[in-house]
UniProtKB/Swiss-Prot annotation:
PANTHER family: KELCH PROTEIN, KELCH REPEAT AND BTB DOMAIN-CONTAINING PROTEIN 3. Residues 150-250 form the BACK domain. It comes from Mus musculus. The gene is Kbtbd3. This is Kelch repeat and BTB domain-containing protein 3. Kelch repeats lie at residues 291-337, 339-390, 400-450, 452-502, 548-595.
Length: 607
């Protein structure tokens, strides 16, 4: 269909008006018509100016069609190549059938991709650099990924340089690794692809030992040519997540291979790590762990303690044995690996409730740090902080425990601490890092990978007690740099009535006064409303785990405490209620902790 329009222009000559006419023509199917004409030239065998020489035959064609469709041919014709001047090119790595199929597509813009020809099209589109056809093949194969063909497609996409297909197939292989590592196709996997699989946190295996078995099986399949790769691949196995007995067995049973490849000492070092620091490695693959929400509270009298845990997978609660945790008023609790760390607090007779605690005339803050090991139900002191502190916050990032804010030992009117410290559980050392930009009270900290967000108030006590949320800091743990963000919340928040939680590396806050959830966009520094939950008590606990936010307990009034637990599914913006806590609680410690399955102290068939 042709579309045209007239544009009339008027001008005058010697006072006499004359009209100039212009006609603009646009043919919507002009390109298709040219393609049809070129195809007719091909059918009539006329105007050919180039030849593709195959082993079986010579195929004539038109340069303009080749250059328009293939980056390979366009580059050939643009530079001073021998083929350009000779008027022909010899192709030996494609069949005549494949080249003819390419030409059919080039001249018509149409083809049919099937299970039988997709690999042929994939190969030729990769070699001839036909991006549209390559993407079509990639999309076709992505829809066909299965346990039967995934390892073959992974190799295929790696060979032909299809990043999209490789990414989708690698994801599938990683999530079905436990079913694939004994297959014959796995044994043929190339070194680079295997390395990418082993590096992933998402590698789906029931225990880390399976990863070590897979590496050794792959090496032994072609020992002479592959044993050189063992020193590199074995570092991708998280050996410190294996038990000491398992590692000792491998030293005994694989002694010759390990020594001949200089890997024996790597296993020995891993055994030393397990002996000295078992449970202090937070890099366990999610599929090898069991995840829990840990709850602990000591009553105001300092004697009655309640400790229980919630199994994420089974939606079940379990009351834990008496742990005798020393959680002083104003202390902070954080999980790290399979351990729980308690820092600081007041040694005096300060009240535990935050409203009363802040008003104490003197804070006898301590620098002590304690570690609780649930696997052994042991509680012990570790290295003390550099500065005594209470009413602070703590958070884990980059395999270090950071303590932020709070007040040190002294009278009630002393200012908030600017000092920030980090603790390395492996070296057992505290280090001072860059201080806060300014003082902050009621700090809430959340870590999103290497970024720590801290929210709170610039005042300690307001007329109505609830100070406004007006401090928002960002700390880059990699560069040791603080920055102050503009708190564009869009509405008023109380610093003591919000809970900050990370979900999939995104910061969320839950407002316990309005029952609303907001997510933070670091690029725009804007908070976005994500929905509302049914209700929540003041002083509730909040936890982010996987793609969910759990809100637990709290109080609606001094004599109205709840045991309710609500879950927000961020992926679908929905709330649901799950099993209630064994006891109604308010103002309690709440942390996520995970255990390697073979070390899980809270596992029970009847959990």
């Amino acid at each position: 269909m042709d579309n045209s329009y007239n544009l009339n222009e008027q001008s005058s000559w010697n006072g006499i008006s004359s009209e100039k006419k212009k006609n603009y023509l646009a043919s919507e199917d002009h390109g298709q018509k040219i393609l049809s004409v070129l195809q007719s030239f091909r059918e009539q065998n006329v105007f050919y100016d180039f030849k593709i020489i195959m082993k079986e035959e010579i195929i004539p064609c038109h340069r303009c069609v080749l250059a328009a469709c293939s980056d390979f041919f366009r580059a050939m014709f643009e530079v001073n190549m021998k083929e350009r001047d000779d008027g022909s090119v010899t192709i030996t790595n494609l069949s005549s059938k494949a080249v003819k199929a390419f030409l059919d597509y080039a001249y018509t813009g149409k083809t049919r991709i099937t299970d039988d020809n997709v690999e042929m099209f994939f190969q030729l589109s990769s070699f001839l650099q036909v991006s549209f056809l390559s993407k079509a093949c990639s999309d076709f194969l992505i829809k066909s990924i299965s346990l039967v063909n995934c390892l073959h497609l992974l190799s295929l996409s790696d060979s032909y340089g299809s990043a999209q297909l490789f990414s989708h197939t690698l994801y599938f292989v990683q999530h079905h690794f436990h079913l694939l590592y004994k297959s014959s196709d796995f044994l043929e996997m190339n070194f680079g692809v295997l390395q990418k699989c082993l590096e992933s946190d998402e590698l789906n295996v029931p225990e880390e030992e399976m990863v070590l078995k897979a590496v050794l099986t792959w090496i032994k399949y072609n020992l002479e040519s592959r044993q050189k790769h063992l020193p590199h691949l074995i570092t991708k196995v998280r050996l410190h997540q294996l038990s000491e007995d398992t590692l000792q067995d491998y030293l005994l049973n694989e002694e010759y291979l390990l020594k001949s490849t200089n890997c024996f000492d790597i296993i020995v070092d891993a055994i030393k790590c397990v002996q000295g620091s078992s449970g202090l490695f937070p890099d366990a693959r999610p599929s090898t762990t069991e995840k829990y929400i840990f709850i602990h509270k000591t009553e105001e009298n300092g004697e009655n303690q309640y400790t229980f845990c919630y199994n994420i997978k089974t939606d079940s609660w379990k009351i834990l044995p008496q742990s005798h945790l020393i959680d002083l008023p104003g202390s902070s609790l954080s999980s790290y690996g399979e351990k729980i760390f308690l820092t600081g607090g007041c040694k005096g007779k300060c009240c535990r409730r935050i409203r009363l605690h802040i008003a104490q005339s003197y804070h006898d803050a301590t620098d002590q740090t304690w570690c609780y090991c649930p696997a052994k139900n042991e509680f012990f002191c570790v290295s003390a902080m550099k500065t005594p502190r209470t009413m602070h916050t703590s958070v884990m990032a980059l395999n270090r425990l950071f303590v932020i804010g709070g007040k040190t030992r002294g009278s009630q009117d002393i200012k908030s601490l600017l000092d920030v410290e980090s603790y390395n559980p492996l070296s057992r050392e505290w280090t001072s890092v860059s201080p806060l930009p300014r003082g902050i009270y009621y700090p809430e900290a959340s870590a999103c990978q290497n970024i720590i967000y801290v929210l709170g108030s610039e005042v300690e006590i307001a007329d109505a007690f609830n100070p406004s949320l007006d401090c928002f800091f960002k700390y880059n743990a990699t560069t040791d740099q603080w920055s102050e963000l503009v708190a564009e919340f869009g509405q008023f928040f109380h610093a003591t009535l919000i809970k900050a939680v990370p979900v999939n590396c995104t910061l969320y806050i839950c407002d316990l006064s309005t029952y609303k959830v907001y997510s933070f966009c670091p690029d725009t520094c804007v908070w976005k409303g994500e929905g509302s939950f049914e209700c929540a008590g003041f002083n509730a606990g909040a936890i982010g785990i996987e793609d969910k936010i759990y809100i637990l307990g709290g109080d609606y009034a001094p004599d109205e405490i709840t045991d309710e637990v609500q879950v927000y599914h961020s992926s679908r913006s929905e709330w649901e209620e799950v099993s209630p806590m064994p006891r109604a609680l308010t103002e309690f410690y709440c942390q996520v902790i995970q255990f390697n399955k073979y070390r899980d102290p809270w596992y029970s068939n009847h959990f």
